[in-house]
């Protein structure tokens, strides 16, 4: 479990703007401008009036010491909007052998240069007498009809990562796309063809070439985030009712 220490503080969202900033109001009535690490569209994750939870850094050099971590929607779903947490959560779960599909490796390296397109892999797993395992981690927060979609905006970077993973398989390695589902309302995951058709096409190609796609949900609270159950990946765009 990833624990928030000190515990996150509550507030109410006023608005998100300039991608990286949000204004909130605390229970005491103080208006704060906080940092938002999520560069995506954040559809359904940033509705004015939602309850938000933020952390505070003790780094005196930070212009905005507070960071937006969680949202609780007005229907009760929890969302981790800090996309930087996805890599941390995946790495922690692998270190603790909680993801059976990714267990048995003796070395976990992070942010290693690889591929032909000047990329960095999120996680590289290695073990003696086993192929290298290249893992790209993506955060899923877009919810529509209990289905989580990725991406929530056109992502040329994400398209590049799929090409790189496919290349790793062609070179004899293992390659995994790990979807960290950080919205408690999501029950299944699909490629957002209606948002980024090229990404959906590349994902299908990558799977056919041998890239594995693994989706896991997480339990979210102001105390921390813990790995939950594996979730199904839909091969088409029709959510289960």
Curated annotation (Swiss-Prot):
<comment type="similarity">
    <text>Belongs to the SfsA family.</text>
</comment>
<dbReference type="InterPro" id="IPR040452">
    <property type="entry name" value="SfsA_C"/>
</dbReference>
<dbReference type="Pfam" id="PF17746">
    <property type="entry name" value="SfsA_N"/>
</dbReference>
<dbReference type="InterPro" id="IPR041465">
    <property type="entry name" value="SfsA_N"/>
</dbReference>
<protein>
    <recommendedName>
        <fullName>Sugar fermentation stimulation protein homolog</fullName>
    </recommendedName>
</protein>
<dbReference type="GO" id="GO:0003677">
    <property type="term" value="F:DNA binding"/>
</dbReference>
<dbReference type="Pfam" id="PF03749">
    <property type="entry name" value="SfsA"/>
</dbReference>
<dbReference type="InterPro" id="IPR005224">
    <property type="entry name" value="SfsA"/>
</dbReference>
